[in-house]
Every structure is written in C-alpha cells, then in structure tokens.
Amino acid sequence: MSQEPRIKLVVTGDDFGYCPHRDKGIVDCFHAKAITNVSLIINGSSAASAASLAQRYNIPIGLHANLSEGFPVCTELKQNSSLINGQGVFHGKMGIRKMLSQGLLDMSEVRKELCAQIKLFCELTGINPQHMDSHQHVHVLPGIREVFAQVLEEHRIHFTRIPVELGLHRCTWLPDTLMEFYKGVEEDALNAIEVFRSHRIRWPELYIGLSTMGKNMSTYNIQEAIRYGVCSWQSTIATLPDITNSVSIELMTHPGYPSIPEDGGCGEGPDDFSQSLDRLHELEVLKSTSLQSFFLGNGVQLCTFRDL
C-alpha cells in the first residue's frame, strides 16, 4: 500500500461499561495502543466505574446510545413507554425494528431517552461526548435517525458513525442471516447520510467492523477491509478537485475479557455475545504484533475523533 494516501484510523472499543471484565480488556487494549477511543454504554452495569477508568487513564470517550437492551435511563420512561416491553426493558435488537416498522415507537420518547443518556454521560465523565453512535446500530433507523441528528446538534456532539462497510458483499464467510441484517443496516445508514449532514454531523470517510467482528477478526481480514475500502475511496474521489490525499477510517471493535453469568449487562445480565470467547479473540488480534506492524508499515496513523 505504499502508493496509498495517508490513513487516519480511529479504533473504537464499543460497549465500555457493560461489565467489569469487558472494561478491563478494553482498558488493556488502550494501554497497548490497540484501540484509541471507547464508546460508553450508559445503562450498562459498570458504566460509572468505566467512566472513572476513562478519567483516570485519559481515554477518549463517546456515548454508545442504547435503545435496544436493558432498562431506560429516563425515569419518566421506566414505567409506561413505547420503548419498553411488559418486563420494563427495551424491545431488543430485532424487537425495536419490529416496533418501528409497525409505527409503534413514540419519537418524543426516543428524544427523552437520548437526552437522558447524554445528561448521565456528562454527569459520570465530566465532559460532553466526543462522539455518539449506538448499540446495535439503532441510530440509523428511519424515524430514529432524524431525532438522533437533532439531539446531537442541540448538544454540540459533532461526530457519529455511518456503518457502511465497502466490500461487505465480498465477505462470503458471513452467514446468510447475518449478511441480511448487515445489508439492512447499511441501507438504513446510507439513508441517514443526508439527515446527518443537514445537522452538520461528521463521521470518518470509511467504516470497518461488520466483516471483522468476533471470530471473523484477523489481521488479514482487517488488512483486506482497509485495502478494499481505500481503493474504492480513491476511485470515488479521483475525479473530484481539491480532495486531500488522506482518508479517515473507523474500525468498530468489541474486545474484552468475556463476561461471566450474572455479572454485567444492562439490567438483564450479560448476553451470549458478551460472554463469548470472541471478545478475548478480538483483544488478542488487536494487540498482535502482526496487526501493529501492518499499521506501522502502511501509513496507518492511529488517532481519535478529535484528530479528524
């Protein structure tokens, strides 16, 4: 990749605050310079201690808005709200999408919950979120994306995530059901672009993380995702004047030491994703000398959102 433009890579550790084991792994990755940034899940069981860790170690931190797992933060919405089911918890990754498709979500309640999560984030960290994305990509869903963009602009949060991974169609190792979900996420994300732009929200030019999650994370897969993304980006901007010869990328990651039963989660205990050894696998790949050598030898500069 010697002929490629300079690459600025934000490596985000998602789900910070989900449980102490995950948090320790994320902090270890930060100390190893394997991630540059974390995204705090504010209704996670260890959100307060995670925020303290970020302050102690000066870890750049944003908000991982959560409307799909666990309990709401907004007190007003804990008892009777379109955002929760009969057990008082959010509807889940697919459940919120079903509720939305049926027109059953009250967007004024979405606004209240997002604002409550930002308020709690500021109370715990002492700062405004440096960026704001979401758990399970709900921020790009129709209806929610408009409210999300308005809330970010009002709170002067300038960066978000657009989960569109160039080259995803080439990833034949992904199961059909997962690929179908990812394609839906990408379609929603593409439709969110103009909404976010209209509210002066920014994001890195490229995104990686769908094809490299869990057991699918490897130095090779990350290399190939970067190579394909950069080549596609170069082709797109080749005919445009006054484009700088650098490109920014966000790599979404979920490293950590696996959760143990009954310890962690967002009020319902840790899910299978968090208890999986895939979390440890991601940690080991991110810290590997092979990946770090690839970055060093190919003009990849690790950075934070503030560096963009």
From Swiss-Prot:
Disulfide bonds: none annotated. Gene3D superfamilies: Glycoside hydrolase/deacetylase. The lineage of its organism: Eukaryota, Metazoa, Chordata, Craniata, Vertebrata. This is Carbohydrate deacetylase. Mg(2+) binds at D15, H135. Its cofactor is Mg(2+). It comes from Xenopus tropicalis. Belongs to the YdjC deacetylase family. One of its GO terms (biological process) is carbohydrate metabolic process. GO terms for molecular function: hydrolase activity; magnesium ion binding. Keywords: Carbohydrate metabolism, Hydrolase, Magnesium, Metal-binding. SUPFAM superfamilies: Glycoside hydrolase/deacetylase.
